[in-house]
Amino acid sequence: CAIDRHQQDNWAIGSHAKALASRAYLASEICQIDTDLAKHDAYSRQLNTQLCARAKAIHGNVTHANTAVAADAAAFCALTARHPATQHAVQLLGGVSTGGDPYLPGLAPIRAIENVLDRHQLNTAKLTHIEIMEAFAVQALACIQGAGLDPDLVNRHGGALARGHPIAASGAILAVRLFHDLRNNGGIGIAAIAAAGGLGTALLLRAE
């Protein structure tokens, strides 16, 4: 169904609010490097309806307020043999990359999510944690609708709309975010992201 500007703005406002409220919780995921840059956050996360209303349109009802800004960031993921990985509380169930319509690349995560869940005989009702790349609020909302996800489980500590979209690092950031949430709380979680050309990738993790 159609996703209007009000829905997009509300999702973006929520992403900023959740990120702001989760700063202390998310601090454990950050490894400080020898720089002062990480101490200076240029974004207040104080997005509201008034700011959204003043935001310039990019295309249609997509605006600068409900679009992730370009950002610099990095995330570290280590690849190991199967045995060391099984010693950790968070277990890799599987991951897939699937192809979709190259003219609708933002919807590609839907097929990837469905595929990886089918492979493991799971459905969305079994998920307790969901991380989706929100390059645009409309894209995140469309993927939530298309994959039948519970929006209350998606990006519960904010997403790229609040933190920015560091292209080439965004997927690893989702994986790190999901890993830490599952390690802290247990459950089954999925992270999904789109890429240019209609590529969708999804990662499925579990923690007892």
Language-model-detected regions and their locations in the chain:
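Active-site pocket-lining segment
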Residues: 93, 99-162
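Condensing-enzyme catalytic core mediating Claisen C-C bond formation in acyl metabolism
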Residues: 49-111, 115, 119, 176, ...
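Structured core elements
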Residues: 77-78, 131, 190, 204
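Internal helix-turn-beta structural module
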Residues: 141-146, 150-155, 160-205
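Cysteine-centered functional microenvironments
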Residues: 1-2, 10-11, 60-69, 128-130, ...
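N-terminal extracellular/periplasmic Venus flytrap/periplasmic-binding protein-like
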Residues: 7-89, 146, 151-153
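Conserved active-site and cofactor/substrate-binding residues in soluble primary-metabolism enzymes
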Residues: 3-14, 43, 47-50, 65, ...
